[in-house]
Amino acid sequence: ESLYKMLGGHVEALSFTAAASSHAVLGKPLKDLQLRKGLLVAAIVRDEHTIIPGGMTTIEDGDHVVVVTRATGLDDLTDILA
């Protein structure tokens, strides 16, 4: 996990690696996930390819997921859920 604070600490960009413990988000289209308010899945890196996700994009085991959020306290990929 990596954390970057931006805009005077009002916004954070975080990077997570999807694993089996993230089963609540794996394989489901982003449009079907109940994401936290004020959170954006900005990019997914899969097999060295960067994906700018859309609603039909899924998060798969081993993906590196970059999220941008106003929320704090996100420690695990499943914390992106509302």
What positions do the PLM features span?
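Long, charged amphipathic helices and adjacent flexible linkers at domain junctions
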Residues: E1-A18
